[in-house]
């Protein structure tokens, strides 16, 4: 039957193929552009709290928000702390 299905199946039109590809591109773009408006302020607030306790370069703090499967969000915070100064 598979051989019969192969010969009798209709091929997708180029318009349908283009539509599917465009939907994939739009979905990918929505995921990548989905950075919330509050993320820069959140980064600034976190940096201020860290600076209360440790002298740090602002470039050493990165905050990223990753969304998976539409309903799961992962907030990733990377802080490179300076090496501890030795007591003399």
Swiss-Prot record:
InterPro entries: MinE, MinE_sf
Keyword Calcium among record annotations: no
Keywords: Cell cycle, Cell division
GO biological-process terms attached to the record: division septum site selection; regulation of division septum assembly
Gene3D superfamilies: Cell division topological specificity factor MinE
A cellular component term, taken from the record's GO annotations: plasma membrane
Pfam families tied to this protein: MinE
Keyword Cell cycle included in the entry's annotation: yes
Annotated HAMAP family: MinE
Protein task: Prevents the cell division inhibition by proteins MinC and MinD at internal division sites while permitting inhibition at polar sites. This ensures cell division at the proper site by restricting the formation of a division septum at the midpoint of the long axis of the cell.
Family: Belongs to the MinE family.
Protein name: Cell division topological specificity factor
